[in-house]
Amino acid sequence: MKPSELPHRAGVGFKPEHFSAIDAAAQPVGFFEVHAENYMGAGGPPHAKLSKLRQDYALSIHGVGLSIGSMQPLDTDHLARLKIVCDRYEPESFSEHLAWSTHDTTFLNDLLPLPYTEMTLTQVCAHIDQVQTLLDRQMLLENPATYLLFEQSTIEETDFLAEIVRRTGCGLLLDVNNVFVASTNHHMDPRDYLSRFPVEWVREIHLSGHSETVDDAGAPLLIDSHDTAIKDPVWALYEELIARTGPIASLVEWDNDVPEWPVLRAEAEAAGAILRRAADRRAA
């Protein structure tokens, strides 16, 4: 099984509207990430641009539609299309979410949470084994942004993720914004969560912006919206994390209200500066 092996640099999510600016620059970022489902067609401009990009950059393919956390079988047609994409581009990394988005023949346009129980643990592990066997590559599993908790849960999320890694050999994608969003929504301490997270298995980090609102009781409610710059509390958590772990491949996500390329590149440069400082401290 091919391991995940992105460079320990800062990358960004690739947006086709940025292609010309990227093509004119000299290695502006460490790697790019794309959503697998956007490249499941056979050809056309998306593939032409990504093929050109792939000649010069490391690539992470990030899935959003496998429904790893579903209690029903994985969609084998979707899996087959995913394999075609991965075989075509040979990415340095493939990742998916600890979430579900299908029910019978209904496909939901969201990543929904699941209770953490022995039953769901067994099902998620079986699904990951199926994916990794088909792709012959290690999959990274991303911690979710959540807006509710389940009374049925009997396992802490960090323990749930650690046990998945132990059983399947997958790696983890640690989304720092998701940690901050979920911790705020559930009135928990994000630093306590990160202190318990199995960081030794993290092969990629995600950073993104979130939107702020209030719930019906007037309490703060954060939405993992990917439509703004990374907020200061998330940067602070990230810098503390990297000081502890050392450099890890780190991706800036900005999927909605996408800015001009220089704005996105500046976010990646800020992450890259944190990575370099951590590397320098370790080398000293």
Swiss-Prot record:
Family that this chain belongs to: Belongs to the UPF0276 family.
Signal peptide: none
Protein's name in the database: UPF0276 protein Arad_4857
Native species: Rhizobium rhizogenes (strain K84 / ATCC BAA-868)
Gene3D superfamilies reported for this sequence: Divalent-metal-dependent TIM barrel enzymes (3.20.20.150)
InterPro entries named among the record's database cross-references: MbnB/TglH/ChrH (IPR007801), Xyl_isomerase-like_sf (IPR036237)
